[in-house]
Amino acid sequence: NSLIKASYFSKKTNLVCLSDDSGLEIDILNGKPGIYSSRWGGKRNNFNLAIKKVFKSIEKVKKNRLTSNKARFICCLTVFWPNGQSYSATGILNGKLSNKKKGNKGFGYDPIFIPKGYKKTFGEMDPSFKIRIDHRHKAYNKIRKFFI
């Protein structure tokens, strides 16, 4: 998806383009919502609705399987040049889901995602700290050589 977006806008503007595609993968849901993470919030990307859908989907699956709250955020960044050259980098942040929303910082699924090695959700963390450990930061560290 990030390649499609970067290619489209680079060709349309004849400029170098950087595109991001990120998503939350939940093990018990076989990687869903994944690249459709924002779509789980409906037409208006309502993440309160998306989070409710996550919890409802997990409850349905729990009845039939051993439970796991493992999850990961994945970000793919793509740089695309007007000459057709491109470079993509992926950042992955493993963690787990909280059993309820915690915190009001950040956006999207931040109130239910706890990064591995931490006890707080992204929604409870100071945004200036979160951005130094998240999946986008990991992807950017791999791609930043094109911007220095």
Predicted regions and their residues:
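Anionic-ligand binding patches
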Residues: 1-148
